[in-house]
A protein has these predicted regions:
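OB-fold/S1-family single-stranded nucleic acid-binding modules
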Residues: 71-94
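Short, basic/aromatic beta-hairpin or loop at an interaction surface
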Residues: 33-45
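N-terminal post-signal-peptidase region of extra-cytosolic proteins
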Residues: 11, 44-53
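Short nucleic-acid-contacting surface segments enriched for D/E, G, S/T with interspersed K/R
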Residues: 49-66
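Envelope-exposed proteins and targeting segments
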Residues: 4, 8, 22-24, 36-38, ...
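Short aromatic-glycine-enriched beta-strand elements
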Residues: 18-29
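Short, glycine/small-residue-enriched coil/turn segments at secondary-structure junctions
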Residues: 1-18
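Residues located in well-ordered beta-strands
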Residues: 9-13, 67, 79
Length: 94
């Protein structure tokens, strides 16, 4: 069971509104100034629409923060929990 969230922030490089799972690719800058792209897996498009998300809610170039469950191998990937667009409210994305 995944119970621990990490919080990451960055710039959206790609977003895929597809079924059965949506994907956000996020360029994240670390404390040393290096950057890496993280793959964030979210709910299906159908489920996201039920929660009030639409295709232009998050777009490439947007700055977002996310609370997600990092992959067990600690690579740059997460199962999304919540997304907060810059200047917006945190909403469930899974």
């Amino acid at each position: 069971m995944m119970t621990e969230y990490i919080r990451i922030s960055g710039i959206v490089t790609e977003i895929h509104w597809i079924n059965p799972h949506s994907w956000i690719f996020l360029e994240v800058t670390d404390a040393e100034g290096g950057s890496a792209v993280w793959a964030l897996e979210g709910a299906s498009v159908t489920e996201l629409r039920r929660r009030g998300w639409v295709e232009d809610s998050v777009e490439p170039g947007d700055r977002i923060s996310a609370r997600c469950h990092q992959l067990r191998d600690r690579s740059n990937g997460c199962l999304l929990g919540y997304v907060t667009p810059e200047g917006g409210e945190e909403k469930l994305f899974d």
